[in-house]
Protein backbone atom coordinates (compact mmCIF):
# COMPACT_ATOMS: atom_id res chain seq x y z
CA UNK A 1 0.00 0.00 0.00
CA UNK A 2 1.21 3.54 -0.67
CA UNK A 3 0.73 6.82 1.12
CA UNK A 4 -2.54 7.28 -0.76
CA UNK A 5 -3.94 4.04 0.64
CA UNK A 6 -4.04 2.15 -2.67
CA UNK A 7 -1.80 -0.76 -3.75
CA UNK A 8 0.21 1.37 -6.17
CA UNK A 9 -0.18 4.99 -7.24
CA UNK A 10 0.23 5.39 -11.03
CA UNK A 11 -0.51 8.46 -13.14
CA UNK A 12 -1.74 7.98 -16.69
CA UNK A 13 0.64 8.55 -19.60
CA UNK A 14 -0.71 10.03 -22.83
CA UNK A 15 -1.31 6.80 -24.77
CA UNK A 16 -1.55 4.34 -21.92
CA UNK A 17 -5.12 4.37 -20.65
CA UNK A 18 -5.26 0.59 -21.07
CA UNK A 19 -2.09 0.21 -18.99
CA UNK A 20 -3.47 2.42 -16.24
CA UNK A 21 -6.55 0.25 -16.06
CA UNK A 22 -4.45 -2.90 -15.78
CA UNK A 23 -2.25 -1.35 -13.09
CA UNK A 24 -5.05 0.04 -10.97
CA UNK A 25 -4.92 -2.76 -8.40
CA UNK A 26 -1.34 -3.88 -8.91
CA UNK A 27 0.38 -5.21 -5.80
CA UNK A 28 4.18 -5.63 -5.66
CA UNK A 29 3.73 -9.27 -4.65
CA UNK A 30 1.74 -9.93 -7.83
CA UNK A 31 4.58 -8.92 -10.17
CA UNK A 32 6.22 -12.07 -11.48
CA UNK A 33 9.95 -12.47 -11.98
CA UNK A 34 12.39 -15.30 -12.64
CA UNK A 35 15.83 -16.09 -11.31
CA UNK A 36 17.28 -14.74 -14.57
CA UNK A 37 15.70 -11.36 -13.76
CA UNK A 38 17.43 -11.47 -10.38
CA UNK A 39 20.73 -12.20 -12.13
CA UNK A 40 20.21 -9.29 -14.54
CA UNK A 41 19.43 -6.94 -11.64
CA UNK A 42 22.86 -7.52 -10.09
CA UNK A 43 24.03 -4.77 -12.45
CA UNK A 44 21.59 -2.37 -10.77
CA UNK A 45 22.20 -3.28 -7.10
CA UNK A 46 25.26 -2.64 -4.93
CA UNK A 47 25.36 -6.21 -3.69
CA UNK A 48 23.26 -9.26 -2.78
CA UNK A 49 22.45 -11.38 0.22
CA UNK A 50 23.64 -14.95 0.74
CA UNK A 51 20.27 -16.48 -0.13
CA UNK A 52 20.18 -14.81 -3.54
CA UNK A 53 23.74 -15.90 -4.25
CA UNK A 54 22.82 -19.47 -3.32
CA UNK A 55 19.75 -19.37 -5.55
CA UNK A 56 21.76 -18.02 -8.49
CA UNK A 57 24.40 -20.72 -8.13
CA UNK A 58 21.73 -23.42 -7.91
CA UNK A 59 20.16 -22.03 -11.10
CA UNK A 60 23.44 -22.50 -12.97
CA UNK A 61 24.94 -19.01 -12.80
CA UNK A 62 28.67 -19.28 -12.10
CA UNK A 63 30.52 -17.14 -9.56
CA UNK A 64 32.64 -15.43 -12.23
CA UNK A 65 29.57 -14.18 -14.10
CA UNK A 66 27.86 -13.11 -10.88
CA UNK A 67 30.84 -10.96 -9.91
CA UNK A 68 31.04 -9.54 -13.44
CA UNK A 69 27.43 -8.33 -13.21
CA UNK A 70 28.14 -6.68 -9.85
CA UNK A 71 31.00 -4.65 -11.34
CA UNK A 72 29.48 -3.55 -14.66
CA UNK A 73 29.38 0.24 -15.15
CA UNK A 74 25.82 1.49 -14.72
CA UNK A 75 23.26 3.02 -12.39
CA UNK A 76 22.80 1.14 -9.10
CA UNK A 77 20.30 1.36 -6.26
CA UNK A 78 21.94 2.04 -2.91
CA UNK A 79 21.89 -0.91 -0.52
CA UNK A 80 19.85 1.04 2.06
CA UNK A 81 17.11 1.43 -0.58
CA UNK A 82 16.95 -2.10 -2.01
CA UNK A 83 19.10 -5.20 -2.52
CA UNK A 84 16.64 -7.44 -4.34
CA UNK A 85 13.59 -7.28 -6.59
CA UNK A 86 10.90 -7.80 -3.89
CA UNK A 87 12.44 -5.13 -1.68
CA UNK A 88 12.74 -2.75 -4.62
CA UNK A 89 9.11 -3.20 -5.68
CA UNK A 90 7.91 -2.63 -2.12
CA UNK A 91 9.90 0.61 -2.00
CA UNK A 92 9.02 2.18 -5.33
CA UNK A 93 5.35 1.24 -5.12
CA UNK A 94 5.06 3.81 -2.32
CA UNK A 95 5.69 6.66 -4.76
CA UNK A 96 3.78 8.05 -7.77
CA UNK A 97 4.81 6.95 -11.25
CA UNK A 98 3.96 8.08 -14.75
CA UNK A 99 3.41 5.44 -17.43
CA UNK A 100 5.56 6.10 -20.48
CA UNK A 101 5.41 4.81 -24.03
CA UNK A 102 8.17 2.33 -24.91
CA UNK A 103 7.51 1.39 -28.53
CA UNK A 104 7.32 -2.30 -27.65
CA UNK A 105 5.15 -4.61 -25.56
CA UNK A 106 6.48 -3.26 -22.27
CA UNK A 107 5.27 -0.42 -20.09
CA UNK A 108 7.78 1.90 -18.48
CA UNK A 109 7.05 3.57 -15.15
CA UNK A 110 9.02 6.64 -14.14
CA UNK A 111 8.82 8.14 -10.67
CA UNK A 112 10.55 10.14 -7.97
CA UNK A 113 11.28 9.27 -4.35
CA UNK A 114 11.00 12.04 -1.79
CA UNK A 115 14.43 13.40 -0.74
CA UNK A 116 12.99 13.71 2.75
CA UNK A 117 12.79 9.90 2.89
CA UNK A 118 16.26 9.30 1.42
CA UNK A 119 18.37 12.47 1.79
CA UNK A 120 21.40 10.93 0.06
CA UNK A 121 19.45 9.58 -2.90
CA UNK A 122 18.18 6.11 -3.80
CA UNK A 123 21.00 5.24 -6.16
CA UNK A 124 23.54 6.48 -8.66
CA UNK A 125 22.76 8.27 -11.91
CA UNK A 126 25.45 6.70 -14.08
CA UNK A 127 24.00 7.46 -17.51
CA UNK A 128 23.90 11.04 -18.84
CA UNK A 129 23.07 12.66 -22.17
CA UNK A 130 26.15 14.20 -23.76
CA UNK A 131 24.43 17.61 -23.66
CA UNK A 132 24.60 17.47 -19.85
CA UNK A 133 28.41 17.38 -20.00
CA UNK A 134 30.86 20.26 -20.21
CA UNK A 135 33.08 20.73 -23.26
CA UNK A 136 36.07 19.33 -21.39
CA UNK A 137 34.05 16.31 -20.27
CA UNK A 138 32.85 15.62 -23.81
CA UNK A 139 36.45 15.71 -24.99
CA UNK A 140 37.32 13.03 -22.41
CA UNK A 141 34.67 10.52 -23.55
CA UNK A 142 36.04 7.12 -24.55
CA UNK A 143 34.69 3.84 -25.89
CA UNK A 144 34.65 0.77 -23.66
CA UNK A 145 33.13 -2.67 -24.03
CA UNK A 146 30.08 -2.80 -21.77
CA UNK A 147 27.27 -5.35 -21.93
CA UNK A 148 28.91 -6.78 -25.04
CA UNK A 149 28.87 -3.49 -26.98
CA UNK A 150 31.26 -0.59 -27.52
CA UNK A 151 29.57 2.20 -25.56
CA UNK A 152 30.49 5.75 -24.54
CA UNK A 153 32.08 6.19 -21.10
CA UNK A 154 33.43 9.07 -19.04
CA UNK A 155 35.62 8.84 -15.95
CA UNK A 156 34.45 11.00 -13.03
CA UNK A 157 35.53 11.48 -9.43
CA UNK A 158 32.09 10.45 -8.16
CA UNK A 159 28.90 9.31 -9.86
CA UNK A 160 26.05 11.65 -8.79
CA UNK A 161 23.07 10.41 -6.76
CA UNK A 162 19.47 10.45 -7.95
CA UNK A 163 15.99 10.18 -6.46
CA UNK A 164 14.44 9.13 -9.77
CA UNK A 165 13.57 5.54 -10.69
CA UNK A 166 12.44 3.64 -13.77
CA UNK A 167 10.56 0.33 -13.68
CA UNK A 168 9.83 -1.74 -16.80
CA UNK A 169 7.04 -4.32 -16.78
CA UNK A 170 5.40 -6.47 -19.43
CA UNK A 171 1.62 -6.88 -19.18
CA UNK A 172 0.39 -10.42 -19.89
CA UNK A 173 -2.92 -12.22 -19.53
CA UNK A 174 -1.50 -13.84 -16.40
CA UNK A 175 -0.36 -10.56 -14.85
CA UNK A 176 2.66 -8.28 -15.00
CA UNK A 177 6.17 -9.59 -15.56
CA UNK A 178 9.22 -7.76 -14.22
CA UNK A 179 11.69 -6.83 -16.99
CA UNK A 180 14.14 -4.43 -15.33
CA UNK A 181 14.47 -1.41 -13.05
CA UNK A 182 17.17 1.16 -12.43
CA UNK A 183 17.75 4.50 -10.71
CA UNK A 184 17.56 7.48 -13.03
CA UNK A 185 15.67 8.55 -16.13
CA UNK A 186 14.01 6.18 -18.62
CA UNK A 187 16.31 4.75 -21.27
CA UNK A 188 15.98 2.76 -24.46
CA UNK A 189 17.29 -0.81 -24.62
CA UNK A 190 20.77 -1.42 -25.95
CA UNK A 191 20.69 -1.94 -29.74
CA UNK A 192 20.27 -5.63 -30.56
CA UNK A 193 19.28 -7.47 -33.74
CA UNK A 194 16.30 -9.12 -32.03
CA UNK A 195 14.63 -5.71 -31.71
CA UNK A 196 14.07 -5.31 -35.45
CA UNK A 197 15.78 -2.85 -37.74
CA UNK A 198 13.75 0.29 -36.96
CA UNK A 199 13.82 -0.22 -33.19
CA UNK A 200 17.51 -1.10 -33.30
CA UNK A 201 18.27 2.17 -35.11
CA UNK A 202 16.27 4.13 -32.51
CA UNK A 203 18.20 2.47 -29.70
CA UNK A 204 21.55 3.05 -31.39
CA UNK A 205 20.73 6.74 -31.85
CA UNK A 206 19.90 6.95 -28.13
CA UNK A 207 23.12 5.29 -26.96
CA UNK A 208 25.23 7.29 -29.40
CA UNK A 209 24.21 10.32 -27.31
CA UNK A 210 24.39 8.84 -23.81
CA UNK A 211 27.44 8.19 -21.66
CA UNK A 212 28.15 5.74 -18.84
CA UNK A 213 29.91 7.41 -15.90
CA UNK A 214 32.66 5.40 -14.22
CA UNK A 215 34.46 6.40 -11.05
CA UNK A 216 38.22 6.83 -11.14
CA UNK A 217 40.36 4.30 -9.35
What are these regions, as identified by a protein language model?
Residues 2, 7-11, 15-18, 23-24, ...:
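Functional cores of ribonucleases/endoribonucleases
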Residues 41:
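Glycine-rich loop/hinge motif
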Residues 44:
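An extracellular/secretory-lumen and virion-surface interaction module
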